[in-house]
Amino acid sequence: MQERIKACFTESIQTQIAAAEALPDAISRAAMTLVQSLLNGNKILCCGNGTSAANAQHFAASMINRFETERPSLPAIALNTDNVVLTAIANDRLHDEVYAKQVRALGHAGDVLLAISTRGNSRDIVKAVEAAVTRDMTIVALTGYDGGELAGLLGPQDVEIRIPSHRSARIQEMHMLTVNCLCDLIDNTLFPHQDD
């Protein structure tokens, strides 16, 4: 059991090292995309399923409340938090539309959709991205594996942050770290810390 525990930690560290080498440009582009949208008076819509839903909620909460330092609230909405809306849409046998309907209702040109999907193939996330495209929104996608169907929907203005792993647990861990990194970059760009 001890060796298995050490193997989990080692694999996680190796994935972080690989991501630290492969992803800085994509994360930087994503952060600047989010910052520019906020500076233009737009908002960020976020969605994901399971652990990805938790990451979407964490991002939105960090924007609305704060990340590590006090600052004004920033407009972000996690689309997976309203159980009444989600179950009303799903009850009409539109499971694939639970996020897309919200994107069409709430999204506007200049807004950003932060779409989080471990494999990039979740139908409801794919449909949300398709809806965002019709609303002239920019997409920031957090994926893993080969990026899945989601990667093929992205245009030149969009950003994919694809975790270099084929293990769901490692991808989800890196998605959380990436979300924290994005929050840090947004805060430090919009509200640079004053050195005392």
Curated annotation (Swiss-Prot):
Q: Relate the outcome reported for changing residue 83 to D.
A: Abolishes association of homodimers into homotetramers. Reduces affinity for DnaA. Strongly reduces DnaA-dependent DNA synthesis
Q: Which organism is it from?
A: Escherichia coli (strain K12)
Family matches, as SUPFAM superfamilies: SIS domain
What's the name of the protein? DnaA initiator-associating protein DiaA
Q: What is the effect of changing residue 190 to A/P?
A: Abolishes interaction with DnaA. Strongly reduces DnaA-dependent DNA synthesis
Assembly and oligomerization: Homotetramer; dimer of dimers. May be in a rapid association-dissociation equilibrium between homodimers and homotetramers. Formation of homotetramers is required for stimulation of replication. Interacts with DnaA.
Known role: Required for the timely initiation of chromosomal replication via direct interactions with the DnaA initiator protein.
Lineage of the native species?
Bacteria, Pseudomonadati, Pseudomonadota, Gammaproteobacteria, Enterobacterales
The gene that this protein is the product of is diaA
Q: What are the boundaries of the region Important for interaction with DnaA?
A: 190-191
GO annotation (BP), single: carbohydrate derivative metabolic process
